[in-house]
């Protein structure tokens, strides 16, 4: 149910080559969707709204924001229940297309340095653009079920033609493909690479399990901006 790199299977050991991309608790727009089943990652797009993959529609969902480190509390932690979940009208559990949903929070998130909304893309991204990929992972000392770290890495966007030639991308529409060229600075067991951020705007969000090799497939958020904005109207 979540987007996972199995590092030893794909390419062995990953190392982060660009430490400048990393900082203390980056990606304050990421939220953790906690449930009794497999967890997922979403993006805060407004204080009261989260955008997430539709396959993350799970029972007993809780939205966690702010600091995720269980051993260190800093007052930014927030857990908010959803009061409304709207999946994209054309989404089907049997296909990876249109894998988007909007979650309305029971109360607006309190914004702080570790809780910030992310603007939506206003244009399509050009092939070759190097974008930021954000996700959640588990620190080496974390043996629990839930991730405790945010991580970023950089990767270039592929052209639609290149994407369609890959095994992962050939059956997708309204998709965004990225090619992973960075490597991790230390070994992780799992990495949930959930979002693509281009020029400080949300350009892509994970599509089910459709990642393999060195290519990641994401829903192209720009293609759905009208639906998102019409649905997530704060009254």
Curated annotation (Swiss-Prot):
Coiled coil: none annotated. Residues 1-19 form the signal peptide. Pfam families: Trypsin. GO terms for molecular function: metal ion binding; serine-type endopeptidase activity. GO terms for biological process: binding of sperm to zona pellucida; cell migration; positive regulation of acrosome reaction; positive regulation of fertilization; protein maturation; proteolysis; regulation of protein processing. Residues 20-233 form the Peptidase S1 domain. SMART domains: Tryp_SPc (SM00020). Keywords: Cytoplasmic vesicle, Disulfide bond, Fertilization, Metal-binding, Secreted, Signal. PROSITE patterns: TRYPSIN_DOM. It is found in: Cytoplasmic vesicle, Secretory vesicle, Acrosome; Secreted. Gene3D superfamilies: Trypsin-like serine proteases. Disulfide bonds join 40-56, 131-198, 163-177. Its main location: cytoplasm. GO terms for cellular component: acrosomal vesicle; extracellular region. Plays a role in male fertility. May have a role in sperm migration or binding to zona-intact eggs. Involved in the activation of the proacrosin/acrosin system. Belongs to the peptidase S1 family. This is Probable inactive serine protease 37. The gene is PRSS37.
